[in-house]
Amino acid sequence: TEMFGIKYPIICGAMMWLCKPPLCAAVSNAGGMGNLTAGNYTTEEEFRGAIRETRRLTDKPFMVNITLLPSIRLTPDHYRMYFKVCAEERVSGIEFSGTPVDKAAGMAAIEGLKKAGVRLFHKVGSVRHAVHAEKVGYDGIYAAGIEEGGHPLNDDVTSMVLVPRIAES
């Protein structure tokens, strides 16, 4: 809440096909953190338009989710485009899920986004991934257990187990 000046410590989960400008803005307007799913957009014009539409619907902060997984229809060119647009539009934050950005796109991508003032978060499903995210320099992590849905890990660790393990590490 302090980092973004939002009223409630609630971040809208990134949901493909659902987290578009109306839902993102509604969550932000209600005091939480809206989350625009980049994967809904395959061109720069569509993606930039969605960010700008969200800004027309709310004057509150919101973030963008970028899922870096080889199993979805997006390519490294899409990821580079998302990074570029997020930096140019100076979105409040990005929630990354899947492959860590430093491994998928290199540290230059992280440095460019941070230089633009974008806060970076990584959604993690294991202690190992949380430790890696901290070492890389993300601004924060989300611990996402198996109940989160759409999880790429094969273990059955819930958030109630994962959060204390990460806090202890």
Where are these regions (language model features)?
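Active-site entrance/lid segments in N-terminal catalytic domains of soluble metabolic enzymes
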Residues: 1-169
